[in-house]
């Protein structure tokens, strides 16, 4: 019922009349643009129907009332605006532009602000006027990127041409509009005021209809339709429409800024009747309103003042136009001081304020005085000048009054900018200027500040440029004015840059001081770089908002000279993978560094330059200096590369760690080679020469292998690069210098038993594992080793070791450690090395105690992180082979990559020595060897034999091949371990030396080569190539660890006997003789069983012994040995801490097991140790005694099965955490022979104590005295109660010889 009444005949507002269509609507406006009680306005013809409820019937752009058009409106700016974001779209309610009565195209625009939307109608000329106002007062076209609207086209298709243009224009403008719009004409175009409310015209808005009565709410009502009002009890409502007395159901009224209908019974009117003698005002809105029935009138009325004057004043105050109306009509002119800068420049038609122009010209001509802009002038002169400018008159500044008071002119200039309603740098950009100044880097800060300046309104931009150029010119006279750029910035900053938030809360103290600091820094930066910031050539195009380059810049070295710079490992991998067509992981393109960043990186590289050399340079002493060829790669901390998924890397690529671009061209010859993954060495640290240990990380991300370009200098380069014999087979003359020719071509890999080691302290001498046979299927790389993986690798097939290379590639399973690390060498070390390395020394050098060797071996070790350790374990752990392929022992066999060429003749010498700790250790080891030789010569009374080759080092556990003519030449002096009775413990800073097995040395006949693999599948290249497997296939089937070797005379071994573990018996001092062999060489190896229970866990590690020997040839001088090589044992003070080896009884050609750490308990009588010196002299050839250096490996992590959850202690050599004291180092002993075996070790993890030993495996018998073997655990054979194999390969021993250099593991 009520709804039907509400939609009935239209209810005309009181005070309006109409006589059908074409009549006029009269209303009084109460908008803020009109004065209170302003008189009637001009009528506006309505074009809508009778039910329009006050909606506009004519387009809003050209009202025929007091509200002017935009072109006719005086320009003004609001002082404060706060409306937020504004969205502008072409109105979807209209099908398109329509033609008005004046044949103009009219477009509907939907304006959305603060969650409210309304449509406005604008012509194309209005759009062009809006564009002109925007770019005159608000935006610069370089910042807004808005196109200038062209003149309206002519023709019938003009509308279709303009619609896409206006759509794009409004979309771009909506992204720019924020609370930075303070231009009155622009906001009026959108029908907005400065607070985001809709600004309605008086002729069209029902809100502007005057009220006929006031009422208060007595009953709450909730709106049921969009055109209804909701109110609560007690609210005040202005009633604008009241129906006749007989129909009082629905009234219309205003509550706040809302207009709508409401039930009449919900409100009560406030009635007011004039007194009987009071004449009602004709203009009163209550005049002629019949009093509703039921409403009682007031009993008495308040009398009004009488007289003409009061009436006139009252009429004037009601009809007085508002300030805004006067400014719009141009009647009220804004003063200069305190006027918005854009409004003042728009009204005056000038580019910069007249105040700034006059003051700056006067000060530059007459104001070069001390303290300009810092000292204040006379206040009366300042006020007089201000009044002159406000009156739009230009004062005469050249008068004597102002010439005598120049500071008043400078104070006036500062006062003008201080009184701007919006500062010169604007409130809106205060935060952006602060953020731009907080970025690091001068160039990036310059770009960011330049971008913020471009966001200034054009009047502010022009004024700022003029002012800053003036201040920069004044700063050049700082010698006369004492006002340089910083002082000028301090006095000008509060006038140019202010924060509205900080001003509103009125901060003081420290907060105000910080604001002043920010202001002064910004203004000083602008003053310093004014020529660049306001230059027409400077642009930030192609840069992101942070100032970083989006467009790649051309590099000067890219493709111009490939050999002029080094490539990192990542770049080399990316280029090689791209050349082979292998998909790589998507990476974010690196943006070119700015000049400032390049300078910082160059300075950082200069600081790291002392560590850019290699430890191999020790062997190039005396060969002349060379240019360092490698730079230290970043070690994995914050830039750790993610692990690669299985199959994502090519299997047929060989890479070097860091090579020039020129060397990558040689990769094509090795396309069929297996790429070995390398485990890089950690950085070293020394107390004397500190080098910060770098964090460890992924080995997969830095895996690399030796370059396949190290082919033979003979004809067949491709064949020799695939095999192991190629590099040296045809050129024996290069053998001596091949060690020093090209250190980067040396391919070293760690033994498989070194998986997961925390401290890889077998540097500077590195090791290399053999590679898998191509015939065996390659197991897929898995992140974790399977539990049932075998610990015994399979045997390699002979065809895999052919010089022609493998038939097909295999997956890499072994890692290679070859990345050198180095530091600078002080002059004292160089002098020491030079004295030790001179063949003929003028003055005798004192013999240094070999005790210094282990003290200097602590200088190159860094901790690997847990993540890296786990990854190394997963890479080194054996994986299950293909089904059906079992090792002789019945276990699955992991595969290793084939060997790569070891040396390449020719090439530049390695870089000069730069690692003091390693060089010192090698130098002292050499000196100790020389001492031993001299002492041996003095006791024997003979002349020392000339060394066959210069001082050389042990390279690898598995060297690829031996040159022709050198494998069997010369007499190789054997040696035997002779531990002393006293075994001093290591100092606290020495790492704990641990051992998983014995190190074996063998005596062999003259002319035989001593090469021995570490396991069944790790066979040296020259053995495989020589057809060793074809010679004795039946011997290989007898024992899982027996591999035929090259030679004719087999060696005889004695069966080792079992001894008690360390915690069940007291170790006995002394050495024990070796018994006769318990089985013939042709008999199969016996099965050794363990009779003891499970011991506690122990830390796995391995001691690597390096023999630094001297053969026949030229003399090799050095300090004399401090003990006789024919004594039963060296002095106690020289034993057990550095692994000194002595003589071996030659009755049988059997190896000695040197148990480096820990020693086994003694279980043999001392008479077994009786070996007279005369017997040894009779059986011992007069050869110099080799010297062995024991380099220990760091401890492993905690055991998974252990209940202890604490992490392992830091490495003893770590400078950050020295860790707890390490137990004393036991003496080195020989494993006694007997039917018993030491106790098995349950797993690779565990506490450091107690230390258990592995028992020796059945040794293999080969020809030529070559020995190999493996250390079994718990019997070594499955199916005999030994349990499942361990998740890591069992340690194996091997004997390796390269001329006069031998390695044992």
From Swiss-Prot:
CDD domains: RhoGAP_CdGAP (cd04384), SH3_ARHGAP32_33 (cd11835). The keyword Phosphoprotein applies. Residues 646-669, 864-873, 992-1020, 1039-1054, 1115-1125, 1292-1305 have a biased composition (Polar residues). Residues 774-786, 895-915 have a biased composition (Pro residues). InterPro entries: PX-Rho_GAP, PX_dom_sf, Rho_GTPase_activation_prot, RhoGAP_dom, SH3-like_dom_sf, SH3_domain. The record marks 374 as: Arginine finger. Residues 596-608 have a biased composition (Basic and acidic residues). SUPFAM superfamilies: GTPase activation domain, GAP, PX domain, SH3-domain. Residues 582-595, 694-733, 787-798, 916-940, 1194-1208 have a biased composition (Low complexity). GO terms for molecular function: GTPase activator activity; phosphatidylinositol binding; protein kinase binding. Keywords: Cell membrane, GTPase activation, Membrane, Methylation, Phosphoprotein, Protein transport, SH3 domain, Transport. Induction: Dramatically induced during adipocyte differentiation. It holds the Pfam family RhoGAP. Residues 83-192 form the PX domain. GO terms for cellular component: cytoplasm; dendritic spine; glutamatergic synapse; plasma membrane; postsynaptic density; protein-containing complex. Residues 210-272 form the SH3 domain. The modification Phosphoserine is found at residues 32, 594, 660, 749. The modification Omega-N-methylarginine is found at residue 1263. The N-terminal PX domain interacts specifically with phosphatidylinositol 4,5-bisphosphate. Specifically interacts with CDC42 and RHOQ/TC10 through its Rho-GAP domain. Interacts with NEK6. This is Rho GTPase-activating protein 33. It comes from Mus musculus (Mouse).
